[in-house]
């Protein structure tokens, strides 16, 4: 039976929210688990869509920023440098540097989920109400963790659509 787990080592609501992030991370990994390098970097028939690799990099990039907002309400320079910008000069999602393989992209994302887990161990129910700076606005820690899960799931739909298009294109060329 599917359910979100409540951990005894986290505050109940924190645990529920973390569980949603963890569940979506596992689901994401299963969706992309058998992708070839070509499929991972496929941008659709017209080469105008974000590839799965770009989306995985983007999810990781967004999530590490949330972890640091929650942890310190700021994003340190070393994180900006390590993960790169959110968009390129054209305003699009950047390509991952050096075309890392699927295992590397998933390892990077899992590392961020583990960082979130460490932060969640320290959060109390009351801490979830704490406001954080977010894109010129504010959001609570609760909303930030929820957003990590929601954002991941949102891009899973894009990845599924790319997979479908990839399979159709491969089938055309195999005829």
Swiss-Prot record:
Pfam families the record matches: DinB_2
SUPFAM superfamilies found in the cross-reference section: DinB/YfiT-like putative metalloenzymes (SSF109854)
Protein name: Uncharacterized protein YkkA
């Amino acid at each position: 039976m599917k359910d979100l787990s409540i951990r005894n080592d986290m505050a109940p609501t924190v645990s529920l929210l973390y569980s949603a992030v963890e569940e979506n991370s596992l689901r994401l990994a299963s969706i992309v688990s058998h992708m070839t390098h070509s499929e991972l970097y496929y941008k659709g028939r017209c080469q105008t869509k974000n590839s799965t690799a770009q989306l995985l990099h983007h999810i990781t990039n967004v999530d590490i920023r949330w972890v640091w907002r929650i942890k310190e309400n700021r994003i340190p320079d070393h994180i900006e440098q390590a993960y790169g910008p959110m968009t390129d000069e054209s305003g699009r999602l950047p390509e991952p540097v050096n075309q890392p393989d699927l295992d590397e992209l998933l390892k990077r994302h899992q590392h961020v989920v583990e960082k979130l887990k460490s932060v969640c161990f320290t959060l109390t129910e009351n801490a979830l109400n704490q406001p954080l700076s977010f894109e010129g606005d504010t959001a609570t820690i609760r909303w930030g963790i929820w957003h990590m899960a929601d954002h991941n799931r949102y891009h899973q739909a894009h990845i599924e659509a790319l997979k479908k298009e990839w399979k159709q294109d491969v089938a055309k060329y195999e005829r």
